[in-house]
Amino acid sequence: MKFELNHDWQGNMSSPRSTLGDKTKIHLFLILAIVWVFTGLVGNSPWIPAESENVSMVMDIVSSNSIIAPLAASQDSINNPPLYPFIGATFVKIFSSILAPHDAIRLSNFIWISLTLVSIGLMTRELWGTGFGRQAGLIFIASIGLIFNVHTIRPEVSALLGFALALYGFALYYRRPFRASLV
């Protein structure tokens, strides 16, 4: 039985391939990430019960300036840290003339998720070397559970950034301990 291999071992007959440079890959990844983050942020009303509770907490900050203990209408104690409602209230005040309050709060998720993507990319670059940050960002974007939860009004989005920054600090510790302690 005879096998015939038609392979050009020297590369004489191969057609020239156009290769993409690193800057082009970074630009394409940034465009993909921006489109992915912005896709579900505006245009839909809060449909999960936790979203309306968080909108109520942000509107309590906006209307009565209760920055000490922002509470939702049905709460008597603080369940989540107030950083997410504070940033959401800032976005509501900035974009109140253009967007509905729940859309402005969702727009603050752009900041949280962008910083999370950057932190994950830096952590991966620190652990595995240059060129792997984009791959980790693509894996992060492709996570099934993330797609449903990133575009909602939840304080867990800011906690995700905290975890990503902590992991980046742990990865950076051996090479630059002072900078890692600042992260």
Task: Annotate each PLM feature.
Residues 2-183:
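Membrane-integral, polyisoprenol-dependent glycosyltransferases
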